[in-house]
C-alpha cells in the first residue's frame, strides 16, 4: 500500500490509469498460466520498500536466467483446490474430477521439483521455494491409479470393486446369451420388431411387435412413441437382470467408499497440498515476469533510494519495439526538476509516460525496457496529470486528441 494520503486518493488511481500500468499488467497476466497467477498479476501494486523491490527484482532475475537455460517449468496443472480440500476436511466426498484436479496439482508440483533438481548449478533466490514443494507421489499415484477419468473408476481401485465387476460381466454375458438365443430363434422371427438386444432402466430387453405381445412371456418396460413396439424383458432373463441390478448397486456403493477414502487421504495432506498450490501460483507469477522480461528485451534496473532516475535507451513497453525511439532521462542528482519542450506530436508525452511507467514497473518487480546502467528510485508516490488521458497504445498525441 502506498502510504501517502495523496497517493491513496483518486488522483493516484487516475495516475496509475494515465500511465497505463493496467495495460502492462494485462500483458503480464497473459504470460501466467494458472488462473490464480493471472489474477495476482492484474492486482500487482508497486512496493515502496526498497529491500522488497530488490527482492522482487532478484526473483525476476532468477526466473529469466532459468528460462534462458532450460525454458519455463509447466504450470498447467495448477488449479484451485482450496474449496474441494475444505469439503474433504469436513468429511465430505470429493467427486472424481476434484480428486483428479488434486492429483494434477501434485503431478505439477513433482515436475517443478524435477525441473529444479535437474541442473541446480548456482543457487538462486528461488531455491527455497523450489525446495519447499512437497511433491506427494504416494497420494498422486493412489488417485491416478484409482481414477482413470472423470467418468471411470479403475478396477484396480480396490479388490472388492474388481470382484464386483467380474461378477457383473458374468451376469451380463449370461443375460445376453439367453436373449441371443431368443432373437436368433426362427420361432420368434415374426414376434420381434427386429433382432436386437437393448436396455431399458438398466435391464436387458428385446423389441416385440405390439400385436404379438402374447408370443413372448415377460415384463414390458417401455413402449415406442408410435405404440407399435413393446420393449419386453423375457422371463428367462429376469434372474440375470436382477443379479445385474444388485451388482450395480454394490458397485455404486463401493465406488462411493473408494471416493470417500481418497477424499480422506487428501484431507490428511491438505496443509501440504495447499502450501504447494500457493508456492506454484507464486512461481507461476515470477516466471511470467521472467517471460515478459524476455519478450520486452528488458533489464534489471539499479534500485536507488535518493529520488534520482537515470534511464539509458529507455523504450515505452506498450509501443511497437521496431518503431519506438529510445530515450535517455536523467533527473534527481544534478537537478530535480525536468521540463520537456518540443513540437506537437514530438514525443513529450511518451517520454513522460515512459519515465512514470518504468518506475512503476520496477517497483512491481518487473524488469524495464532500458539499457544497462539504468537506475530508478523507489518512490512513495508517482502522480501524473496528462491531458485527455491519451493512450500510448493508440498512438494518440495530446495535440491530436484536442484536434479530434
Regions found by a protein language model. Give the residues of each.
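Non-transmembrane, heptad-repeat alpha-helical coiled-coil rod segments
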Residues: 248-282
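Short, small-residue-biased leader/transition segments that mark boundaries at the very start
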Residues: 1-8
Amino acid at each position: 500500500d502506498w502510504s501517502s494520503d495523496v497517493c491513496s486518493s483518486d488522483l493516484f488511481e487516475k495516475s496509475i490509469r494515465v500511465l497505463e500500468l493496467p495495460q502492462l499488467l494485462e500483458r503480464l497476466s497473459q504470460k501466467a498460466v494458472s488462473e490464480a497467477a493471472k489474477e495476482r498479476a492484474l492486482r500487482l501494486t508497486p512496493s515502496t520498500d526498497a529491500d522488497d523491490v530488490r527482492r522482487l527484482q532478484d526473483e525476476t532475475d532468477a526466473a529469466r536466467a532459468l528460462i534462458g537455460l532450460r525454458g519455463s517449468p509447466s504450470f498447467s496443472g495448477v488449479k484451485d483446490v482450496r474449496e474441494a480440500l475444505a469439503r474433504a476436511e469436513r468429511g465430505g466426498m470429493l467427486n472424481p474430477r476434484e480428486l483428479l484436479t488434486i492429483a494434477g496439482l501434485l503431478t505439477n508440483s513433482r515436475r517443478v521439483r524435477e525441473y529444479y533438481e535437474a541442473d541446480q548449478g548456482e543457487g538462486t533466490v528461488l531455491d527455497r521455494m523450489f525446495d519447499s514443494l512437497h511433491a506427494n507421489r504416494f497420494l498422486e499415484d493412489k488417485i491416478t491409479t484409482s481414477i482413470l477419468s472423470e467418468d471411470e473408476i479403475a478396477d484396480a481401485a480396490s479388490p472388492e470393486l474388481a470382484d464386483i465387476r467380474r461378477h457383473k460381466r458374468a451376469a451380463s454375458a449370461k443375460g445376453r446369451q439367453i436373449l441371443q438365443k431368443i432373437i436368433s430363434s426362427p420361432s420368434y422371427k415374426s414376434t420381434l420388431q427386429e433382432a436386437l438386444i437393448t436396455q431399458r432402466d438398466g435391464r436387458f430387453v428385446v423389441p416385440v411387435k405390439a400385436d404379438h405381445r402374447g408370443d413372448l412371456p415377460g415384463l414390458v418396460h417401455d413402449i415406442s412413441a408410435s405404440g407399435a413396439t413393446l420393449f419386453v424383458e423375457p422371463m428367462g432373463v429376469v434372474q440375470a437382470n436382477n443379479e445385474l441390478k444388485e451388482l450395480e448397486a454394490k458397485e455404486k456403493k463401493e465406488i462411493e467408499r473408494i471416493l470417500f477414502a481418497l477424499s480422506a487421504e487428501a484431507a490428511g495432506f491438505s496443509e501440504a497440498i495447499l502450501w504447494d498450490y500457493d508456492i506454484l501460483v507464486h512461481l507461476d507469477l515470477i516466471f511470467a515476469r521472467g517471460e515478459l522480461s524476455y519478450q520486452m528485451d528488458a533489464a534489471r534496473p539499479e534500485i536507488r533510494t535518493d529520488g534520482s532516475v537515470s534511464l539509458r535507451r529507455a523504450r515505452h513497453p506498450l509501443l511497437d519495439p521496431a518503431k519506438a525511439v529510445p530515450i535517455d532521462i536523467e533527473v534527481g542528482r544534478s537537478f530535480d526538476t525536468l521540463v520537456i519542450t518540443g513540437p506537437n506530436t514530438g514525443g513529450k508525452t511518451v517520454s513522460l509516460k515512459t519515465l512514470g511507467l518504468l518506475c512503476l514497473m520496477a517497483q512491481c518487480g518487473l524488469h524495464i525496457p532500458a539499457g544497462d546502467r539504468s537506475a530508478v528510485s523507489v518512490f512513495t508516490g508517482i502522480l501524473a496529470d496528462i491531458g485527455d488521458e491519451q493512450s500510448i497504445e493508440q498512438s494518440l498525441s495530446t495535440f491530436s486528441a484536442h484536434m479530434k
